[in-house]
Amino acid sequence: MSTEEMWFPDWDNGGCKQPGVYMAGSPWSKNPASVRHYANSPHKLVQNWDTPILVTHGELDYRVPVEQGMSAFNAAQMMGVPSKMILFPDENHWILKPQNSIHWNREFFAWLDQYCK
């Protein structure tokens, strides 16, 4: 399966050539904006994580591969950060099926009740 969205990171990081529009450049470029962008990538800052994290992910998501959600969850677990992961095998980027949406809302608001009071 292919999608134009596979090019979004390049657009977000340098594919835009409009004058005055800030973009960092491709991930492999060495321009200062691209280097700064990579230096601030969340995966390089895991050692600073201390906020509880709830990861919800649709396994059919082609925008954000499920492995990225799992990686964030695993990193939080390894750091001892309170964390929970909820996978939806039949959902994409958004959790839209009625039964899944109800489950998502219950989990989300329970999480807020637990950590935001």
Label each region the model flagged:
Residues 1-117:
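Active-site-proximal cap/loop segments of hydrolase catalytic domains
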